[in-house]
Amino acid sequence: MRVAVWGNSRAGLNFARRLEWAGHTIESLEDPSELDRFDALLLAVTARELEGAVGDVAKHVRPRQIVIHTSLLAGVEALDELETRGCLTIAAAPMGWESCAISTLDEVTDTVIGLLLTEIHMTPEHLPEEQRLERAARMYYAEMLWALHSRAALAAKIIDDFPSHVPDLDTGDIIDAYPAAVELGMARNYRDVARMVGEQERIEELELWAVRKEAPWQNNS
């Protein structure tokens, strides 16, 4: 299957890489007008970028074309404009290395994503919309801790190389999941870990956001 990738979120690019390992042809899409050459479109964008991405490609998709987005913060409803144009729309957000939160509209798309996940050795999990934000906050916190642990273990020579699975540290989604971290009573830990990860991984936007949130004059909710 020929898959076009629009965007550069880490979650999306890691998902695309796994599809490529499974034998699919992956190509970065520079011009949406070229979409007719592809069987599927992967929107590798964060939740805050999703509406713009849908607008970018809407005029160029075709009926029965598979469209997948990979942000855990948004369900398949975010692709409604493409669904009305006849696309097979799917939300499929990787949660770690083995599972994937999916959201579909019918049995056809459920079967499509089920087959794709089988090919890339991932297990589908139907995640209720009302649980997305909380689950995202917990997962992003865990992945940030994992990144810190891996770097520390490498520096201490506990491990010889950085693990092959790079965590999906997408700044926009990490920041947008923060309200759930506040509700869960983990706001301070979330901010502290985000600041350290931003500094360690040289993700300036994430580091500066965390520093501002830590400032005593800020409303940290």
PLM feature segments, named:
Residues L154-S221:
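Interdomain hinge/lid region at the active-site interface
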Residues V5-R10, A44-A47, T70-L72, S103-E107, ...:
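Structural motif
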Residues L72-A74, G96, Q131, Y178-V182:
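Glycine-rich beta-alpha junction loops
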Residues M1-D36, I158:
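NAD(P)+-binding Rossmann beta1-loop-alpha1 motif at the extreme N-terminus of oxidoreductases
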Residues P32-E98:
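Rossmann-like NAD(P)(H) cofactor-binding subdomain of soluble oxidoreductases
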Residues F15, W21, L82-R85, W97-I175:
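Internal alpha-helical scaffold of NAD(P)-dependent oxidoreductase catalytic cores
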Residues L29-D31, A92, L127-E129:
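Conserved beta-strand termini and adjacent loop/short-helix elements that scaffold enzyme active sites
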